[in-house]
Amino acid sequence: MTLSFDLTTEGARDALRARAAPEKPSLIGLTRAELGEALVASGIVPERQAKMRAQQLWHWMYVRGVSDFAGMFNISKDLRAELDKHFTVARPEIVEEQISSDGTRKWLFRFPPRGAGRPVEIETVYIPEEGRGTLCISSQVGCTLTCSFCHTGTQKLVRNLTTEEILAQLLTARDRLGDFPDRDTPDGAIVPAEGRKVSNIVMMGMGEPLYNFEAVKKALLIASDGDGLSLSKRRITLSTSGVVPEIFRTGEEIGVMLAISLHATNDDLRDLLVPINKKYPLKELIAACRAYPGLSNAKRITFEYVMLKDVNDSIEDAKGLIKLLKGIPAKINLIPFNPWPGTNYQCSDWETIEKFADYINNAGYASPIRTPRGRDILAACGQLKSESERMRKVDRLALEAMMIAGHGEA
């Protein structure tokens, strides 16, 4: 059974009115140094207190998960009022929450226009498994890559997400799952039996993370900060379709696990499936992978390979894959194609996928077949696409009018 909660009706008018007011800057997504600078620049904290106050706020935002200054009890009431006057730590609007029959959750978040002309929406997916819970995070509204098998690729790029908006997906998911101290897990929620509800994050949602490098870098460094959200970098994976110039920087400056959306073993086919290959062909991509900082058997690169019937699923393709990746510490994730409305592709037969996996395994590579999750709510790999077009026209126009009347499109 699939559950879907439309969260726009309750408080929708309040949300519209709130958007008419000038947008307060968020403290989410600032470094500690930037937090201190913002407090001093606002005139509410003297410079000598900036470092201490920044640390207090950091703890409340990222350890306790507080989304309202009123809940920061070790800060004076007067200072809390001043903070609320100048800044916000609020969560984004949740338009809809869908819960799959397998426990997968998908949220549709709405963010301010920030240059896009109207409010924007993105999707975030939570996948519970035995012993871990993985959050699939988006980095852009839409995508420029137009990978032919991917639903997100049919949505034009609207804009990059900010560091705040990337982190907001993680913070809100932890809110909804009861993953902060003194929070209750929702009744009936499927989550890991022990430990964190969100133990892993993957930058595999909407968009190409390396086309939004600085915001993604900052968000992941905050997410992995040991005095805050404290996610291990070994539990953070960044997936790229092959933006070669930024791959080395990812390892050097962020230090997280790397995944490559490969899907083909020759340039002719990859040009069709993943058009960025025309700019950065396989020879350059594989060379960048071999040079990835820290690459070892303990820090393998994951290569994602979607199984498309009669396209890339032959044993000859498997042989080509082994030859291409020879010498690279790697894991190869085989992804049964997840259908979406309007696609021309079909998923490979299960027997074909198993034979492909057996060949890869016998060649010495771990080759798990990814279990499709959340297909019934279009939350599976390659199915994400924000659905702003579902807003009733009258509501969308009213929302846009109030946004523009309040503070323009910035």
Curated annotation (Swiss-Prot):
Cysteine pairings via disulfide bonds: 136-381
Any one GO molecular function term: 4 iron, 4 sulfur cluster binding
Domain Radical SAM core: 129-378
Binding of S-adenosyl-L-methionine, residues: 207-208, 239, 261-263, 338
Keyword Iron on entry: yes
Catalytic activities: adenosine(2503) in 23S rRNA + 2 reduced [2Fe-2S]-[ferredoxin] + 2 S-adenosyl-L-methionine = 2-methyladenosine(2503) in 23S rRNA + 5'-deoxyadenosine + L-methionine + 2 oxidized [2Fe-2S]-[ferredoxin] + S-adenosyl-L-homocysteine; adenosine(37) in tRNA + 2 reduced [2Fe-2S]-[ferredoxin] + 2 S-adenosyl-L-methionine = 2-methyladenosine(37) in tRNA + 5'-deoxyadenosine + L-methionine + 2 oxidized [2Fe-2S]-[ferredoxin] + S-adenosyl-L-homocysteine
Family annotation (Gene3D superfamilies): 1.10.150.530, Aldolase class I (3.20.20.70)
Active site per database record: 123, 381
Pfam families found in the cross-reference section: Radical_SAM (PF04055), RlmN_N (PF21016)
Residues engaged in binding [4Fe-4S] cluster: 143, 147, 150
Entry's Gene Ontology cellular component terms: cytoplasm
Keyword Magnesium recorded: no
Cofactor: [4Fe-4S] cluster
Annotated family: Belongs to the radical SAM superfamily. RlmN family.
PANTHER family from the UniProt entry: 23S RRNA METHYLTRANSFERASE, RADICAL SAM CORE DOMAIN-CONTAINING PROTEIN
Note: Reaction proceeds by a ping-pong mechanism involving intermediate methylation of a conserved cysteine residue.
Physiological role: Specifically methylates position 2 of adenine 2503 in 23S rRNA and position 2 of adenine 37 in tRNAs. m2A2503 modification seems to play a crucial role in the proofreading step occurring at the peptidyl transferase center and thus would serve to optimize ribosomal fidelity.
HAMAP family: RNA_methyltr_RlmN
Name assigned to this protein: Dual-specificity RNA methyltransferase RlmN
